[in-house]
């Protein structure tokens, strides 16, 4: 059977992956010296914690063993596994998965570097499920997903400058001036999977319009 595996940067809630039969590897979040496995709290709870924290949370990639446990079970069940993971330029998650694959004598594990994050990974996974259900084999699905990722562009509007200040990218004064001026930074993921600046806009409405251009 063809199955899909994502990490928790995929924008899927834990309950959603369980319902759809998607395997999910969590990322560890460290906030205020407390380690939380992504999925143990909801997105809203996480955003509330970040908003109330003085510093931004830190994340750590899953270990090779986390993937190895899943890969060995796939081999045991003779499942074909398609892994769609967070951009290799943003995390070492893909490196951990690749190392784990090298430790399993099994050629039915396929690892895709999404070169993206969040909802893009979810879109790719949902499309992969559609292809599987239409009768495509794993290699055909991987080929289609590799083509798909080059056609998707991820943009985001930063609604507040507070997190840039917490992360040390802006001073308190700069953040204050930017907030008063209603500056909204536009960020994107480049073709090679890195975070890049698209520009700045005045006001949320203008920022969203600039993304569409």
Residue ranges and their predicted role:
Residues 3, 9-17, 22-28, 89, ...:
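Mixed-charge interfacial surface used for oligomerization/domain docking
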Residues 3-61:
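N-terminal glycine-rich anion-binding loop in soluble enzyme alpha/beta folds
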Residues 36, 114-117:
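A short, ordered amphipathic alpha-helix with a cationic face
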Residues 60-70:
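Glycine-rich, highly charged phosphate/nucleotide-binding loops
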Residues 73-81:
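Glycine-rich phosphate-binding loop signature in dinucleotide/nucleotide-binding domains
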């Amino acid at each position: 059977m063809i199955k899909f595996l994502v990490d928790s940067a995929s924008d899927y809630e834990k309950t959603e992956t369980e319902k759809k039969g998607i395997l999910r590897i969590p990322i560890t979040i460290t906030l205020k010296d407390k380690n939380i496995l992504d999925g143990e709290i909801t997105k809203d709870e996480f955003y509330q914690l970040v908003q109330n924290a003085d510093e931004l949370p830190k994340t750590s990639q899953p270990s090779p063993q986390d993937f190895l446990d899943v890969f060995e079970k796939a081999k045991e069940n003779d499942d074909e596994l398609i892994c769609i993971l967070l951009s290799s330029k943003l995390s070492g998650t893909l490196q951990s998965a690749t190392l784990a694959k090298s430790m399993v004598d099994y050629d039915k594990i396929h690892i895709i570097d999404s070169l993206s994050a969040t909802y893009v990974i979810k879109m790719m996974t949902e499309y992969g499920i559609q292809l599987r259900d239409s009768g495509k084999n794993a290699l055909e699905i991987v080929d289609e997903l590799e083509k798909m990722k080059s056609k998707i562009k991820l943009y985001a509007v930063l609604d507040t400058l507070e997190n840039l200040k917490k992360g040390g990218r802006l001073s308190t004064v700069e953040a204050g001036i930017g907030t008063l001026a209603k500056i909204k930074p536009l960020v994107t993921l480049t073709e090679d999977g890195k975070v890049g600046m698209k520009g700045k806009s005045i006001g949320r409405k203008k920022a969203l319009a600039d993304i569409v251009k």
